[in-house]
A protein has these predicted regions:
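Intrinsically disordered, low-complexity, mixed-charge
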Residues: 1-78
């Protein structure tokens, strides 16, 4: 199981409360990291014991978002 990753979320993810949604889910699950808008996507660097649960919730997004794709890349560290 992964415990960290760099997540790129593409679709309608800006202006729909996506970053506050990510923050709330991360806080609730004890996930650490960062989230930022980068052009037409949101980039999340995240790590923690419940990373897979966090990834599943982020992949669904908040109600106003439309997720077209989610890509998970390795995030350095152990």
């Amino acid at each position: 199981m992964r415990d960290r990753g760099r997540i790129h979320v593409r679709g309608i993810v800006q202006g729909v409360g996506f970053r506050p949604f990510v923050y709330a889910r991360a806080r609730a699950l004890g996930i650490r990291g960062s989230v930022k808008n980068t052009g037409s996507q949101v980039e999340i660097n995240a790590w923690g014991d419940r990373f897979e649960t966090f990834l599943a919730e982020v992949s669904r997004g908040p109600p106003l978002a439309r997720i077209d794709s989610v890509e998970v890349l390795p995030l350095g560290g152990s």
